[in-house]
Amino acid sequence: MGCISSKNVSCLTDQGDSPLPEPGLLSTSQQHRVLIDHSLEASHNSKRSRKSRRLGGSDLRIGVSLGSSHRNIEAEQAAAGWPAWLCSAAAEAVHGWVPLKAEAFQKLEKIGQGTYSSVFRAREVETGKMVALKKVKFDNLQPESIRFMAREILILRKLNHPNIMKLEGIVTSRASSSIYLVFEYMEHDLAGLSSNPDIRFTEPQIKCYMKQLLWGLEHCHMRGVIHRDIKASNILVNNKGVLKLGDFGLANVVTPSNKNQLTSRVVTLWYRAPELLMGSTSYGVSVDLWSVGCVFAEILMGKPILKGRTEIEQLHKIYKLCGSPQDSFWKRTKLPHATSFKPQHTYEATLRERCKDLSATGVYLLETLLSMEPDKRGTASSALNSEYFLTRPYACDPSSLPKYPPNKEMDAKYRDDMRRKRANLKLRDSGVGRKHKRPHRAEYDPKNYAKLPIRKDTLEVKNIPNEASRATTTTHGNYYKVSDLPMTTGPASGFAWAVKRRKDPDNISTLTYYQPSSKSQLSGTSVAFAKNTFGLNLKPDNDSVWEVQGNNYDDVIEEVPSHESKLSRIGERHGSLDGSGLDFSQREEDSPKKTLEHLQFGKQSISGPLIFKSGKIDEILQRNESNIRQAVRKSHLQREQDDR
């Protein structure tokens, strides 16, 4: 009895903070039992405290031993050949494995390209077996990037299913900064097969592919793995008809701790679920089911069914295909900005119209997978148990599937490029849609002056002494003769000029100016050209009125450097053909008398097409050209007199 009562008292004191009974209210025997019980409880508490101190010390020793064991594991992995940056950041990813040597494989051509990886076909040197080497892109100096890469390795090691790509090894070395993942080589992917115009799948073949895809996805979801990048190019097929799900670079393991902390920036845009497009960060396996529905429709139609260029356009295409959600959907959704994605117009679903050749059970399965509400898409297991796979014709055996030449996404892109090139060649031969070719940019580049051939119609100025005929065109500090200049020059020199033969009797030479990014062309001998290029105060004829239109300041002509535009290089020779210092509109009698020191070189403030309202442009051009010829002739005569 005493033991029972003592246990009861002890139990009460443990359960709550109830006060002790007062000794006056109890008998002597009861008071004695209470005191004994409390003395026993105190002794038990002291024993527990001593035991906890001993356990605390043992916990500390265990922590120290764990830390030392972790360092020992890193040392063992480094001795096995793993790089130090991988052992320190993600040792668990390669625990128990030994790295493969790069010399054991002969890398061949590239067969795939992704955002975070590149895939190559390779041959194992010892056995001659074909494998696929996936080079993962990451920064080995950033631990987070290393752990992101290692997550794919951990997930692949966790999964083991005939319809999932199996990781066979890792190629790296102690001094390497890269990693290659070794997989079985698969000859095809669904993107290449479905887009091939020579391949048309039958319904039993489609069911065979879809069942294998759902089997592999069911294995992932049962282990808490969401793929998050299911698309046709990531679904691989070998010549035996076996389908395998690959590329787990964006996959993640969903746990209660991270269920509401996922990112919405996953899945390729054409296969992305609407809740991800709306910015959801709390989702489950239903995002993979939506992608499976997109792949299902792509196999049926031979092309992606939802090809949006932006997220908003992708949502709009989803509304047009699956119909706009009901009002109840917007009320139940927990997304903060979901109402901003609500369409202004109600869309009716057009999926049945686009899948007329599909059976009723197939359309129902496709509508289920492409449901706007994630809860209505079901699971991979429910899709496998749908009537589509339980009705005739049944899925065929994978070994009975036909064998095709290698077809991958890169092959499909190559076929599309060749098809476009052939179409362009046909249009070019027929003359339809032919466009005039614009002059090559190299003609305007001042660096290519010496490399370009001289135009045949360039008029050389002869019988003029070398010093008088030298054009002081300043381009990056180089000087060129008149006969060495091409017909067009770039904007860096501040002007462009060329003398051309004209078929008209007057043989008027014109100067052509090309603005950096303007399609308009303006004669270099016009008054407006000289004024806007060199800042001269020139007055055109009263009948010739011109305007400057446009405010494009991106086409401003570069200012001629002062150290390169000194008039000492020209001297007092007014016959020099330096376009940066010659007043083309000066009168014939004033030309040999005036100096060029009063000219101010500045930057063009307004760039744009110049429109002349008068029709007397030819007279201005002829007079200016006459002034140039007279200046050259008088300079020649003046030089001859000086030589005498």
Swiss-Prot record:
Expressed specifically in flowers and pollen. ATP binds at I111, G112, Q113, G114, T115, Y116, S117, S118, V119, K134. It is found in: Nucleus. Disruption phenotype: Light green to yellow seeds. The keyword Nucleus applies. Autophosphorylated. One of its GO terms (molecular function) is ATP binding. Residues 105-389 form the Protein kinase domain. A motif (Nuclear localization signal) lies at residues 420-427. Disulfide bonds: none annotated. The keyword Coiled coil does not apply. The modification Phosphotyrosine is found at Y116. Keywords: ATP-binding, Kinase, Nucleotide-binding, Nucleus, Phosphoprotein, Serine/threonine-protein kinase, Transferase. Residues 565-576 have a biased composition (Basic and acidic residues). Residues 565-591 are annotated as: Disordered. It is an enzyme of class 2 (transferase). GO terms for cellular component: nucleus. Gene3D superfamilies: Phosphorylase Kinase, domain 1 (3.30.200.20), Transferase(Phosphotransferase) domain 1 (1.10.510.10). The modification Phosphothreonine is found at T263. The active site is at D229. Its main location: nucleus. It holds the Pfam family Pkinase. The protein kinase domain is predicted to be catalytically inactive. This is Cyclin-dependent kinase C-2 C. It comes from Arabidopsis thaliana. The lineage of its organism: Eukaryota, Viridiplantae, Streptophyta, Embryophyta, Tracheophyta.
